[in-house]
Amino acid sequence: MRAKLGGRARAGAALALVVSVTVLAAACSGGSPAPVSTAFAGAAAPSGSWPDPNGDLANTRNAPDAEISAANVSGLREAWAFKLTGTAAAGVQSLGSLTAPPVVQGGVVYLQDQDANVYALALATGKLKWEYQVNLPEQSGPGPDGVAVADGVVYGDSSTSAFALSAATGQTIWADSNLLNSGQGAFEIQPQVAGGRVYLASAYGSGPGGGVLMALNASTGHLLWTFNTVIGVGAGVQALGLGSGGAWETPLIGTDGSVTFGTGNPYQSIGEAIAHPSRQLYTDSEVNLDAATGKLRWYYQAVPNDFADHDLQSSPIATTIGGVPVTIAGGKVGYVYALNARTGALLWKTPVGEHNGHDNDSLLALSHQLTITYPYTVAPGSLGGILSNMAVADGSVYVATIDLPITYTGSNSVTGNKAGGPESGEIEALSLATGKVEWDTKVATLPLGAATVSNNLLFTTLYTGTLIALDRATGAIVYQHQLPTSANAPIAVFGNTVLVPSGGPKTSAKGGGGNPQLVAYTIP
């Protein structure tokens, strides 16, 4: 289960998708107040593109066209801010209103908030071009949500529906609220689109059932295939006990005709894992499927019988080691894995962040060898490990990790009962060839902005509302900037621009205030 920095109630699967589209000046009429765009004098207009949720279909989060480097990063200035208003600005406890990165194509920024509303903005000015209103607050879960864009169409989802919009006008092309059956959870994922197919997944937070991976026809929305991430006797129904699985983050589109998802944990307590141990396939796994048919090619399970919420949920990354295609994987389990992309065979794995000796406890429970004394503290905990996506560039893997142990006071909890220590974070570089740690930089709070490469810099954001850049060679922090609010979403870096969803709750930022917003920073 993706770590929740706050909670949201889920709506039933039968809830209809209610949508309205407001275009240009009409965005101000009726309903919630229109979002507000503010331009700032003295800054260059943003330029460039970030065409996919993680920058490219390989999920590398490396911006080869970026102009920002250590030589000019100090010149970043706020060019514009797009502020959410009304119910979309309220946020949800500590989650905030923006948890997904924007997508930028053709001079337009496409953004989705936590209420599933979609916005199209002019990249140069931040002005609203159109808005697609879903307005289903308090029901779309912890996200990340977000959109994908291809061939003039914007693809998105709410908790129970998927939809396609005209990128030019925001008008609905198709929408389907009948994709998920009872027990298959909700859509939380930022989709991906390639080869005429839209790839989605549901995830599930509690109770029997399980998530499902799927592909839709991009033109019609017709369901092409599904793959259940728990082994069951019916669609998405776990036969081995409580199930979860599903996928939270954008999948990897392979050049070999495959699609790879990182999946979440089985929703089971320590007591259940000890009393009724099972591998719980295909939870906490990399699942490689034929992109056209959904047929399983291979899988790699990181944590069989997981009871500590150690998802392998991060977006997989495609790269090569010595000419061999490789998939880089990671997640809340607190490990980075290099897998042979043809077979799923493990090449290396490296622990990142804080670990306190309980990495093999789920395996011990599987073989009936685990005895636990309470209180029982685990690091990484259910809110720790790798919570945002990684980056790969020039022979290195870049990882942002959260150090936050979780304490269980009894055997019935699934995600732990209380924090087991202070929260902090780390940003690390690993050798792509060997997995060896190249450097490790400590940060005082949670790095949630994902790892993003721009020339000789690595960017991310901290939850308390700070944009930072590190020297890729040494890990030294060479740039810091206070954001308007806290930050709980990956950023985008391209051309002369850094786009930052500063969408956390305004009360939790140190020195920040105002509505959640997307902020564009540019160099001259």
How should these model regions be labeled?
Residues A34-Q93, K127-L136, Q171-L180, H222-I231, ...:
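Aromatic (tryptophan-biased) beta-strands that constitute blades/sheets of beta-rich domains
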Residues V118-Y132, A215-T229, W248, G254-T255, ...:
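Carboxylate/His-rich catalytic cores and anion/metal-binding grooves
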Residues A70-V73, L123, A167, A218, ...:
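Inter-blade boundary loops/turns of WD-repeat beta-propellers
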Residues R2-A16:
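Bacterial N-terminal signal peptides that target proteins for export
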Residues A120, A164, A215, E286-N288, ...:
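Conserved blade-register residue in beta-propeller folds
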